[in-house]
Amino acid sequence: MSWQSYVDSFLVGAGKGMGGAIIGLQGGVWAASANCTPSAQESVAIGTACASNIAGLQQTGVVIGGKKYMITRVDADEGTAMGKKGAEGISIYKTKQAVIIGYFSDASVSAGQNSDATYKCAKYLMDAGY
């Protein structure tokens, strides 16, 4: 399966979200949907923050595609973060080698549904050694 197929199958669809991205911990976008594409600089910032101090995201926020999301919840032990920007939101899960970002843009998908879908993608990759 290509990296893009993980985004398409785990992060996009009814009850999952409207998109997402997989980036490396050193930066670099492995796969992304059109509506959730971090720039090269953004992917490095997210990957570095998640690799070193994910709790710091609450102070800095997360920028994806030029949009800044306020981080509302972090669990440093689990390597997770949740963020909002108006009706939009993101779920972030860190694996050994990557950061999985789930994205939703309206009330048709709840933050909980998006977080669950993002977790399932991250868990699948962790079980595969990523």
From Swiss-Prot:
The UniProt record lists the keyword Magnesium: no
Regions annotated as coiled coil: none
Any one GO cellular component localisation term in the record: cell cortex
GO molecular function: actin monomer binding
Record's subcellular location: Cytoplasm, Cytoskeleton; Cell projection, Phagocytic cup; Cytoplasmic vesicle, Phagosome
Record has Zinc-finger as a keyword: no
The entry's keywords: Actin-binding, Cell projection, Cytoplasm, Cytoplasmic vesicle, Cytoskeleton
Major localization class: cytoplasm
SMART domains: PROF (SM00392)
Stated role: Binds to actin and affects the structure of the cytoskeleton. At high concentrations, profilin prevents the polymerization of actin, whereas it enhances it at low concentrations. By binding to PIP2, it inhibits the formation of IP3 and DG.
PANTHER family: PROFILIN (PTHR11604:SF0)
Family as reported in the entry's similarity comment: Belongs to the profilin family.
Subunit organization: Interacts with actin. Interacts with RHO1 (GTP-bound form).
Protein name in UniProt: Profilin-1
